[in-house]
């Protein structure tokens, strides 16, 4: 099992380039199911979740060529000959975003069979909002043997109001509505940049969508969509992780190929902590000198403080002078990294959805265990400032969403090495069709 060995104490210095957003690439790949024509996606990150999505689409009969190593990380998908409209449990259990194929499949082929995702390390992410929305669009939904089965001759436009904000639910039903008969109005939609990026791709494919970037989307269905070429937005969570790495280690970093407008809540919070931030076009410079001030962070849907940055911010809070309070409002059970940070010397008390972090505490290297993607990132950050050597086990979690993170950190001066093989041959990201 892969591990990271990190020796802390080195300020990070230099430039780092952010990869494409995994959470934008996954729905974009699913959107290729909506057309018989090729869809070309650029800036696709080389991470495990993309490999899983490729395997899922190929199992349905799609041709997928992951062009890593080529210009712009260009990926081509062609779903002309779909032979098996099913997402198996073996694939869905490793990546819950696999359920994003439900809407596109039933919209284009009239049927879909998608495994229920089961449990999740960071709490419930129910698929019921997807199901209720598809039923509103006229799909007949049944559940059998752990699978959701959807059928429809052609979906019909309707008025959908989400009971709670859901990113994947918004994306799934948005894709389905593009091929529905008539007009669909969706209210209380997620406004994350990744949702907006998907909408822009769909418009390039011929979809008619109004209200992009707002909480109300109006979709006028069309008979068919065509191929398109699209560049995936930069990964705001990777950018935020490196920005915190610079602040935490007392470094001076230029985080390049990012969109500062997607980072507003995080950058504002870090400035409260005393971190110097300079945004310029597609880059953010982070400088940290002297004492970090404590601060409180409460996760919210976009444009609020992102839940996917909560664990990383907690690592920063351990090095702030005073008490910080971190509140997790999106998911339950998303403080699993806290006990591992405590093993390294952090002073953290959990009270329900609140974590009280008292700093500044010296951290020391220890053997720790990663429980999920963002928890992995928080442990890497803590290890960068810990005295001595930290061994992080189960780093396959971090490989799901960060492209070659150890290489990028080494390029900034960090002492980090991997034990194990990043992409075993059976999971090779090399171009396959």
UniProtKB/Swiss-Prot annotation:
Binding-site residues for UDP-N-acetyl-alpha-D-glucosamine, renumbered to this chain: 96, 125-129, 308, 330
Record bears the keyword Cytoplasm: yes
Active site location: 120
GO molecular function (one): UDP-N-acetylglucosamine 1-carboxyvinyltransferase activity
Modified residues (2-(S-cysteinyl)pyruvic acid O-phosphothioketal): 120
InterPro entries in the record: Enolpyruvate_Tfrase_dom (IPR001986), Enolpyruvate_Tfrase_sf (IPR036968), MurA_subfamily (IPR050068), RNA3'P_cycl/enolpyr_Trfase_a/b (IPR013792), UDP_GlcNAc_COvinyl_MurA (IPR005750)
Protein's pathway: Cell wall biogenesis; peptidoglycan biosynthesis
A GO cellular-component term linked to this record: cytoplasm
Keywords assigned: Cell cycle, Cell division, Cell shape, Cell wall biogenesis/degradation, Cytoplasm, Peptidoglycan synthesis, Pyruvate, Transferase
Disulfide-linked positions: none
UniProt-listed CDD domains: UdpNAET (cd01555)
Protein name (Swiss-Prot/TrEMBL): UDP-N-acetylglucosamine 1-carboxyvinyltransferase
Binding site for phosphoenolpyruvate: 22-23
General function of this protein: Cell wall formation. Adds enolpyruvyl to UDP-N-acetylglucosamine.
Origin organism lineage: Bacteria, Pseudomonadati, Acidobacteriota, Terriglobia, Terriglobales
Transmembrane segments: none
Tagged with keyword Transferase: yes
Enzyme type, top EC level: transferase
Reactions catalysed according to its record: phosphoenolpyruvate + UDP-N-acetyl-alpha-D-glucosamine = UDP-N-acetyl-3-O-(1-carboxyvinyl)-alpha-D-glucosamine + phosphate
Intracellular or extracellular location(s): Cytoplasm
Predominant subcellular localization, coarse grouping: cytoplasm
GO biological process: cell division; cell wall organization; peptidoglycan biosynthetic process; regulation of cell shape; UDP-N-acetylgalactosamine biosynthetic process
Domain of life: Bacteria
Annotated family: Belongs to the EPSP synthase family. MurA subfamily.
């Amino acid at each position: 099992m892969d591990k990271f060995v990190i020796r802390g104490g080195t300020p990070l210095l230099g430039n780092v380039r952010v990869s494409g957003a995994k959470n934008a690439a996954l729905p974009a790949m699913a959107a290729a199911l909506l057309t018989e024509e090729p869809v070309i996606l650029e800036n696709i990150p080389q991470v495990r979740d993309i490999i899983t999505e490729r395997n899922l689409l190929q199992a349905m009969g799609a041709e997928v060529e992951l062009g890593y190593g080529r210009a712009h990380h260009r990926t081509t998908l062609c779903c002309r000959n779909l032979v098996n409209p099913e997402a198996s449990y073996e694939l869905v259990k490793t990546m819950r975003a696999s359920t994003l194929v439900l809407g596109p499949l039933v919209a284009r082929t009239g049927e879909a069979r998608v495994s229920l995702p089961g449990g999740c390390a960071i709490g419930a992410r129910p698929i019921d909002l997807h199901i209720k929305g598809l039923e509103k669009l006229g799909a007949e939904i049944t559940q059998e043997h752990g699978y959701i089965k959807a059928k429809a001759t052609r979906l019909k436009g309707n008025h959908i109001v989400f009971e709670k904000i859901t990113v994947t639910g918004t994306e799934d039903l948005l894709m389905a509505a593009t091929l529905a008969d008539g007009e669909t109005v969706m209210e209380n939609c997620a406004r994350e940049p990744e949702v907006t990026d998907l909408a822009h791709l769909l418009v390039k494919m011929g979809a008619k969508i109004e209200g992009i970037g707002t909480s109300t989307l109006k979709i006028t269905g069309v008979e068919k969509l065509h191929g398109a070429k699209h560049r995936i937005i930069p990964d705001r969570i990777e950018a935020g992780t490196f920005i915190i790495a610079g602040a935490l280690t007392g470094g001076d970093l230029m985080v390049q190929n990012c969109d500062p407008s997607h980072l507003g809540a995080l950058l504002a919070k870090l400035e409260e902590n005393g971190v110097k931030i300079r945004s310029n076009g597609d880059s953010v410079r982070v400088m940290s000198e002297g004492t970090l001030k404590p601060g409180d962070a409460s996760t919210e849907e976009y444009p609020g403080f992102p839940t996917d940055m909560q664990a990383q911010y907690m690592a920063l809070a351990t090095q702030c002078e005073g008490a910080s309070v971190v509140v997790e409002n999106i998911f339950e059970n998303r403080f699993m990294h806290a006990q591992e940070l405590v093993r390294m010397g952090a002073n953290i008390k959990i009270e329900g959805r609140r974590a009280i972090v008292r700093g500044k505490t010296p951290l020391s290297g220890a053997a720790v265990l990663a429980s999920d993607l963002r928890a992995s990132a928080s442990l890497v950050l803590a290890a960068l400032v810990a005295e001595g050597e930290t061994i992080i086990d189960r780093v396959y979690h971090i490989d799901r969403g960060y492209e070659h993170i150890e290489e990028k950190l080494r390029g900034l001066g960090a002492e980090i090495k991997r034990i194990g093989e990043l992409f075993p041959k059976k999971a090779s990201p090399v171009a396959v069709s």
